[in-house]
Amino acid sequence: MRFAICNETYQNTSFDAMCADAAAAGYEGIEIAPFTLAEDPRDLTLADAISCCTKAKNHGLEILGLHWLLTKPSWFHITTPDAVQRRETARFGRHLVRLCAAMGGKIMVWGSPKARNLLPEWNYDDAFARAAEAVREVAIEAGKH
C-alpha cells in the first residue's frame, strides 16, 4: 500500500518545502488542492503545473491528482439553475483537467460540498441533471488526456 498526503495540510509552506517534508515523512504521492497554488486557480498555467510536477518528482513524489476543485473562486456551482454560473464552473473544470494532466495526475476528486449543495427550492432531479451535464463536459476534456 502506498500513502499520499493532501498539500493543503501544508498551507503557508512553499510547494518545494512541502514536497521535501512529505517525502521525508515517507509519503509517495500528493494530492493538490488548486486553491493552495493560487488565490484564483484560473490564473494557474500549464507551465505552473509542469513546475509542480518537476518539484514533486525531484523529491520522489507522484502527483496523484486534484481535490477540493471548486473551493475558489467560491461562486462555482454545478447544480445551480443559473446556466452562466454552471457554464463557467464547467469551463473551470476543464482547465483543472488540463492542469491535472500536466502535473501527471490521473484523479480529480469532486468534493467541495458548497459547490454542489441544493437550495430548498431546487428540484433534486433537475439539479442532478444539471450537475451531470456540467461534469460530463469536464469528463469529455479528461478523455483527451
Predicted regions and their residues:
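Boundary/entry segment of secreted carbohydrate-active catalytic domains
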Residues: 1-13
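Active-site-proximal loop/turn and secondary-structure-junction residues that shape catalytic pockets
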Residues: 9-11, 34-36, 69-72, 114-116
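Catalytic domains of carbohydrate-active enzymes, especially glycoside hydrolases
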Residues: 16-35, 103-104
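Conserved beta-strand positions in the central sheet of alpha/beta enzyme cores
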Residues: 31, 65-67, 109
